[in-house]
């Protein structure tokens, strides 16, 4: 009887680990784990978010997607040695920190032109670095 309980307990633990592992694989943000592709995906989403008119009906949805991608991108690549030291990553991290800080402080307010220009410049630099592989 004790042996059966022990085996069932182990089986249940294994099933829970597999279930949690499988649900953790899909972040829901559209990031794949391919650094170059994920960087370009995040840039495209963020460009859409910062260029969206204030009265756009899908503004909140786009901002939520942008926030999710920012969090997922940083959490995936901050500690990875192969991506963390790249120039494109440090440029992206600077841009993402600026935008995340703005969203945290000001929420739904329009992004100032000065910040938009700086973000666009950093996105362009990151894209060029990705193309060169750095």
UniProtKB/Swiss-Prot annotation:
Subcellular location per UniProt equals: Cellular thylakoid membrane
Specify the protein name: Photosystem II lipoprotein Psb27
User: Sites of S-diacylglycerol cysteine lipid linkage?
Assistant: 25
Q: What happens when the gene is disrupted?
A: Not essential for photoautotrophic growth, under CaCl(2) limiting-conditions absolutely required. Impaired recovery after photoinhibition due to impaired assembly of the calcium-manganese-oxide cluster, especially at high light intensities. CP43 (psbC) is more susceptible to degradation, higher turnover of D1 (psbA). Calcium-manganese-oxide cluster assembly is improved in a double psbO-psb27 mutant. A double psbM-psb27 mutant is incapable of photoautotrophic growth, but does assemble the CP43-less assembly intermediate.
Q: Does the keyword Chaperone apply?
A: no
Chief subcellular location equals membrane
Q: Which UniProt keywords apply?
A: Lipoprotein, Membrane, Palmitate, Photosynthesis, Photosystem II, Signal, Thylakoid
* Family annotation (Gene3D superfamilies): Photosystem II Pbs27 (1.20.58.810)
Q: Which residues form the signal peptide?
A: 1-24
Q: What is this protein's function per UniProt? A: Plays a role in the repair and/or biogenesis of the calcium-manganese-oxide cluster on the lumenal face of the thylakoid membrane. Photosystem II (PSII) complexes containing this protein are monomeric, are assembly intermediates lacking the calcium-manganese-oxide cluster and miss some of the lumenal subunits. Probably blocks binding of some of the small lumenal subunits.
- Give residues with lipid attachment (N-palmitoyl cysteine): 25
Q: How does it assemble?
A: Monomer. Forms a complex with a monomeric, partially assembled PSII. This is probably the complex in which D1 is assembled and/or replaced. Present in 6-10% of PSII complexes; mostly in monomeric PSII. These PSII do not evolve oxygen, do not have an assembled calcium-manganese-oxide cluster.
Q: How does it sit in the membrane?
A: Lipid-anchor
Please provide, in alphabetical order, the Gene Ontology terms of the cellular component aspect for this entry. Answer: plasma membrane-derived thylakoid membrane; plasma membrane-derived thylakoid photosystem II; thylakoid lumen
Organism encoding this protein:
Synechocystis sp. (strain ATCC 27184 / PCC 6803 / Kazusa)
Q: Among the record's GO biological process terms, what is one? A: photosystem II assembly
For this chain, the family text in UniProt reads: Belongs to the Psb27 family.
PROSITE patterns per the UniProt record, alphabetical: PROKAR_LIPOPROTEIN (PS51257)
Listed as disulfide-bonded, the cysteine pairs are: none
Kindly name one Pfam family recorded for this protein: PSII_Pbs27
């Amino acid at each position: 009887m004790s042996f059966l309980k022990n085996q069932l307990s182990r089986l249940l633990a294994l099933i829970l680990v597999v279930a949690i592992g499988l649900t953790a694989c899909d972040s829901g943000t559209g990031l794949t784990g391919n650094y170059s592709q994920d960087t370009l995906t995040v840039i495209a989403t963020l460009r859409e978010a910062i260029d969206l008119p204030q009265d756009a009906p899908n503004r909140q949805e786009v901002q939520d997607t942008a926030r999710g991608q920012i969090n997922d991108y940083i959490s995936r690549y901050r500690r990875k040695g192969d991506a963390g030291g790249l120039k494109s990553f440090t440029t992206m991290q600077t841009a993402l920190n600026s935008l995340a800080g703005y969203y945290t402080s000001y929420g739904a307010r329009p992004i100032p032109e000065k910040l938009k220009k700086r973000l666009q410049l950093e996105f362009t630099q990151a894209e060029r670095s990705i193309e060169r592989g750095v």
